[in-house]
Amino acid sequence: DKSDVLIELAQKHAKENQLTIEYLASDAESLIKRQSQSFDIVCCMELLEHVPDPSSLIQACSALAKPGAWVFFSSINRNPRAYLLAIIGAEYLLKLLPRGTHDYKKFIRPSELASSARLAGLTLKQLQGIHYHPLTQNYALTEDISVNYLAALQKRS
């Protein structure tokens, strides 16, 4: 992560749970210079819809992964239902997120992610929806990818 504050929170969580995890305050492009094609798993969660060039970030994540490695992305689909739930619902009605957190135009359809991933040497293996239950504050995997979704891709050898 690029945020020192979030790195500190993650380190605190790891220490409290007696986990041995190395956290780095870095962006993907800087990390490529030091550790290109060195990771078995690369996760990029809830970030693609916030960057100016998602295809560039997908390419960077692929560059960090070893051949045969897994790369995971989560994002928000771009359609009216996603707008209603992720922006109107989460930001304005339920106030789960600050207003303006999301820009509908930056939401990414799974087909767009898959297309950019193919160009980056990644093959889409599985796509799952993620559903948030506001009353129980729990998440569940679902077949419905109309709002939040998780993509599992594998780097070609």
Language-model region placement:
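Class I SAM-dependent methyltransferase SAM/SAH-binding core
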Residues: 1-31
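A short acidic, Gly/Pro-enriched loop at the edge of an enzyme's catalytic core
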Residues: 29-42
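A short SAM/SAH-binding and catalytic strip from SAM-dependent methyltransferases
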Residues: 41-53
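A short glycine-rich, Lys/Arg-flanked "PGG" loop and its adjoining helix->strand segment in the class I
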Residues: 55-70
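Conserved class I S-adenosyl-L-methionine
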Residues: 70-94
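Acceptor-substrate binding/catalytic loop of class I
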Residues: 75, 92-112
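Short alpha-helix
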Residues: 104-127
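Core SAM-dependent methyltransferase catalytic element
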Residues: 137-157
